[in-house]
């Protein structure tokens, strides 16, 4: 048996630790259900990582399915309320919808939770400036 065959067998046997868009039913409960199955399979408690939830939101923004995207971003914030990236995700979703005031409120929260050393800090600053400019027009 080749190493590639063994890898393929294990790859398909175990659930990925990272939920993909095609595995998301559109219901937030499906995220919890998926990670309950992963946890059971691996014998340890695993929760959806913050970035996985946020990436699902970005995916649905890209498909212009804003209702799903906003629901995911809000769920991300509920699960990770101290994570600035979660608020920036929501800000991005609202910005893409043209909801600039809501986007600004969310990015302001991201900035309140981050420091200048945070990887996304400059992204938040740039988004805040852009939104403030859009709201002046």
What kind of region is each of these model predictions?
Residues 1-46:
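C-terminal catalytic histidine-bearing segment of alpha/beta-hydrolase fold enzymes
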């Amino acid at each position: 048996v080749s190493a590639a065959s063994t890898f393929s067998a294990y790859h398909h046997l175990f659930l990925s630790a990272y939920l993909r868009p095609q595995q998301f039913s559109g219901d937030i409960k499906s995220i919890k259900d998926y990670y309950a199955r992963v946890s059971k399979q691996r014998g340890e408690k695993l929760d959806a990582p913050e970035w996985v939830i946020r990436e699902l939101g970005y995916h649905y923004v890209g498909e212009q399915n804003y209702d799903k995207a906003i629901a995911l971003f809000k769920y991300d914030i509920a699960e990770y309320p101290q994570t600035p990236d979660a608020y920036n995700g929501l800000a991005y979703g609202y910005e893409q919808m043209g909801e600039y005031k809501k986007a600004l409120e969310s990015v302001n929260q991201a900035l309140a939770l981050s420091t200048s050393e945070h990887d996304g800090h400059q992204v938040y600053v740039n988004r805040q400036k852009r939104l403030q400019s859009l709201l002046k027009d």
